[in-house]
Amino acid sequence: MARMNRPAPVEVTYKNMRFLITHNPTNATLNKFIEELKKYGVTTIVRVCEATYDTTLVEKEGIHVLDWPFDDGAPPSNQIVDDWLSLVKIKFREEPGCCIAVHCVAGLGRAPVLVALALIEGGMKYEDAVQFIRQKRRGAFNSKQLLYLEKYRPKMRLRFKDSNGHRNNCCIQ
């Protein structure tokens, strides 16, 4: 079987959020994958595709793996969106400067969708979030995912008001 050329992992940073969008490793490429995660200070991986590797080595390195698979080319379920936004809010509040890695098979569809949702919830417009991610991850998103993101209405879960009732420009307080 021919080896697929996979895009390099890309870091997406917005306000106080840091994400690493990447493709899935295999057991054969796991050590290199772990090195890459450590280089970016990743403490949590969200795996949104079927498992292609054993998580034992990753967990031994202190990196928590969450399995939230959803169908390739499709938008995430409401439950996955809720879980994702809760994770983002908690991680960046409790571990400032940390990085959350997200991967699907190629890192072009499902993983970028979750990162785009976090950017939108953080105050970025849908079009800007798509362009911002595509500048770093060419080919990200298919037409069904773009339509989902266009219709997505932020719940303002990653924006807060200060004690005076003013919107705080900081994403998470």
Swiss-Prot record:
PTM field: Farnesylated. Farnesylation is required for membrane targeting. Unfarnesylated forms are shifted into the nucleus.
Active-site residue list: D72 (proton donor), C104 (phosphocysteine intermediate)
Keyword Membrane applies: yes
EC number: 3.1.3.48
Gene3D superfamilies: Protein tyrosine phosphatase superfamily
UniProt domain Tyrosine-protein phosphatase: residue ranges: 8-161
Similarity comment text for this entry: Belongs to the protein-tyrosine phosphatase family.
Subunit: Homotrimer. Interacts with ATF5. Interacts with tubulin.
Single GO MF descriptor: protein tyrosine phosphatase activity
Membrane topology: Lipid-anchor
Protein location: Cell membrane; Early endosome; Endoplasmic reticulum; Cytoplasm
Gene responsible for this protein: PTP4A1
The protein's role, per its UniProt record: Protein tyrosine phosphatase which stimulates progression from G1 into S phase during mitosis. May play a role in the development and maintenance of differentiating epithelial tissues. Enhances cell proliferation, cell motility and invasive activity, and promotes cancer metastasis.
Organism: Homo sapiens
Residues carrying Cysteine methyl ester: C170
Name the UniProt record assigns to this protein: Protein tyrosine phosphatase type IVA 1
